[in-house]
From Swiss-Prot:
It holds the Pfam family Citrate_synt. It comes from Aedes aegypti (Yellowfever mosquito). GO terms for cellular component: mitochondrial matrix. The keyword Acetylation does not apply. Citrate synthase is found in nearly all cells capable of oxidative metabolism. Its EC number is 2.3.3.16. It catalyses: oxaloacetate + acetyl-CoA + H2O = citrate + CoA + H(+). This is Probable citrate synthase 2, mitochondrial.
C-alpha cells in the first residue's frame, strides 16, 4: 500500500526508534517480478484508503497562506500530494520513508557493487516496497527490452546542431517520442478513466528505458564526433548500459552513476521539474509531453545548473589559490566572495537545515575512491570552512552543503568534464521519481491543477491594507 504524504510526513518526523517499523513495513513486498501486476493489486486498496480519508477529513485545514508566501514562490504552502518522497528539514530526503543511508543498505546492488541500483529505487518509489534482487533484475531486463528508439527520433538527434544545448536536444527528443504514446492513443480511442494509469505506466516504462539511449546519443553527437553508442546489453543493468553507451568502461564510474541516478531521482513534489510534470500531466497530457515540460524547467539556471556554478567557482578558487591551499587562504577567499555580494555556491537549501545527505553519500564515495584528488580535497577544505563563516554572518538559515556542492567534482574526476551535459544526467535520474508520481496521479484520479490567483489590489483589499 502506498504511503500518502500526510502519513509519510508523520512517520518521517517521528521518533527515530520508529525507523525499524518503517523498514519492516516497506519490506513487506510481493514476490512477483511483474511490476504492473504488483501495482494492479495495490492501486484499488490505495484508492479506497484515500477515498475514505477524504470523506472523513476533506474539510480539515492543513495550513495557512500568507501574503509573503504568495509573492515568494509559494514556498511553504502545503498544496500538493506526493506519494514518493518527503523532505525532512533535519534528516533530508526520505524515499517512501527510507533515508538515503537506509536505501544504500536495503536496496539490491549489482554483483560486486556497493551502491544501490536505480531500478530498485524506482520499484520502491512506485510501490512503496523494497524489491528483491529478482524483481530488480526483471526490471533491468524489461527496460533493456523497451530501450530501442524509433527511427524518426534517431534521425532527429543525428541532425541536430552540435551547438544546440544538450537539454534542448533532450526536450526535443522526448517530445518527439510522444508519437509512440500508448496513453495518447488509448485516450483518443475513449479508454475509461479508471484505466488511464495503465497506459501512463506503459509510457513511463518506455520513456525511462529510452532515456539513457537518448542521453548517450546526445553526448556522443555533441562531444564525441557522433561516434555510435553501441547496442543495449540485456544482461547489464540500466546504469551500466548508460555508462557503456556514453563511452566509459570504468566500473568505479558505473558505481558512481548508480549512486548519482539514485540520489537525484526525487525530491518531493514541489520543485520545478516535479511540479511541472505533475501540472502538465494533470491536463491529461501524456508522459512524454509532461516530462519534456519538466525538463524545460530543469534547464533553468535556478534549478538544474547549480552543480555547474559550483564547479566554475571551484575552478576560479583553485586558479587563484593553487592546489593544497591552506584553510586560512580558503577562509580569506570565502570572505572575499561574500563581501563582494556573492553567495557560496552549493551551500544552503530552501528546506534542509542540516548537511544534505546526498552530499554526505557522495563525500563517502570520494573518500573511498578518490581521497587524494586535489579538487575533492579542496571541496573538503571548503566543507570545514564555510559553515562556521555562514553561521557567523547570521543571515543564513542553512549554512550546510547541498547535493550540488559535490556531484560535479566526482564527474570531473572520472573524465566526464562537459558541464553543459550535467543537467541531462540530472534529468535522466529525475525521470524515476516524477514518472512514478505521474502513474499515481492518474491512479488516484487527481484532477487538473487550477489554483486561485489574486491581484495585488485584491490582496490589499482582502487583508485590509490601504492601496
Amino acid at each position: 500500500m502506498a504511503l500518502s504524504r500526510i502519513y509519510s510526513s508523520k512517520l518521517a518526523s517521528a521518533n527515530k526508534n520508529l525507523l525499524p517499523v518503517i523498514t519492516t513495513y516497506v519490506r513487506n513486498a510481493s514476490d512477483s517480478t511483474d511490476l504492473k501486476a504488483v501495482l494492479s493489486e495495490k492501486i484499488p486498496k490505495e484508492q479506497e484508503r484515500v477515498k475514505n480519508f477524504r470523506k472523513q477529513f476533506g474539510a480539515t485545514k492543513v495550513g495557512e497562506v500568507t501574503v509573503d508566501m504568495m509573492y515568494g514562490g509559494m514556498r511553504g504552502i502545503k498544496g500538493l500530494v506526493c506519494e514518493t518522497s518527503v523532505l525532512d528539514p533535519d534528516e533530508g530526503i526520505r524515499f517512501r520513508g527510507l533515508s538515503i543511508p537506509e536505501c544504500q543498505k536495503v536496496l539490491p546492488k549489482a554483483p560486486g557493487g556497493a551502491e544501490p541500483l536505480p531500478e530498485g529505487l524506482f520499484w520502491l518509489l512506485i510501490t512503496g516496497d523494497v524489491p528483491t534482487k529478482a524483481q530488480v533484475d526483471a526490471l533491468s531486463r524489461e527496460w533493456a527490452n523497451r530501450a530501442a528508439l524509433p527511427s524518426h527520433v534517431v534521425t532527429m538527434l543525428n541532425n541536430m546542431p552540435t551547438t544546440l544545448h544538450p537539454m534542448s536536444q533532450l526536450s526535443c527528443a522526448v517530445t518527439a517520442l510522444n508519437h509512440e504514446s500508448k496513453y495518447a492513443k488509448a485516450y483518443s480511442e475513449g479508454v475509461h478513466k479508471s484505466k488511464y494509469w495503465e497506459y501512463v505506466y506503459e509510457d513511463s516504462m518506455d520513456l525511462i528505458a529510452k532515456l539513457p539511449v537518448v542521453a548517450a546519443t546526445i553526448y556522443r553527437n555533441t562531444y564525441r564526433d557522433g561516434k555510435g553508442i553501441g547496442a543495449i546489453d540485456p544482461k547489464k543493468d540500466w546504469s551500466a548500459n548508460f555508462t557503456k553507451m556514453l563511452g566509459y568502461e570504468d566500473e568505479q564510474f558505473t558505481e558512481l552513476m548508480r549512486l548519482y541516478l539514485t540520489i537525484h531521482s526525487d525530491h518531493e513534489g514541489g520543485n520545478v521539474s516535479a511540479h511541472t510534470v505533475h501540472l502538465v500531466g494533470s491536463a491529461l497530457s501524456d508522459p512524454y509531453l509532461s516530462f519534456a515540460a519538466g525538463m524545460n524547467g530543469l534547464a533553468g539556471p535556478l534549478h538544474g545548473l547549480a552543480n555547474q556554478e559550483v564547479l566554475v567557482w571551484l575552478q576560479k578558487l583553485r586558479k587563484e589559490l593553487g592546489d593544497n591551499a591552506s584553510e586560512d587562504k580558503v577562509k580569506d577567499f570565502i570572505w572575499k566572495t561574500l563581501k563582494s555580494g556573492q553567495v557560496v555556491p552549493g551551500y544552503g537549501h530552501a528546506v534542509l537545515r542540516k548537511t544534505d545527505p546526498r552530499y554526505t553519500c557522495q563525500r563517502e564515495f570520494a573518500l573511498k575512491h578518490l581521497p587524494n584528488d586535489p579538487l575533492f580535497q579542496l571541496v573538503s577544505n571548503i566543507y570545514k570552512v564555510v559553515p562556521p563563516i555562514l553561521t557567523e554572518l547570521g543571515k543564513v538559515k542553512n549554512p550546510w552543503p547541498n547535493v550540488d556542492a559535490h556531484s560535479g567534482v566526482l564527474l570531473q574526476y572520472y573524465g566526464l568534464k562537459e558541464m553543459n551535459y550535467y543537467t541531462v544526467l540530472f534529468g535522466v535520474s529525475r525521470a524515476l521519481g516524477v514518472l512514478a508520481s505521474l502513474v499515481w496521479d492518474r491512479a488516484l484520479g487527481l484532477p487538473i491543477e487550477r489554483p486561485k490567483s489574486m491581484s495585488t489590489d485584491g490582496l490589499m483589499k482582502a487583508v485590509g491594507a490601504a492601496k
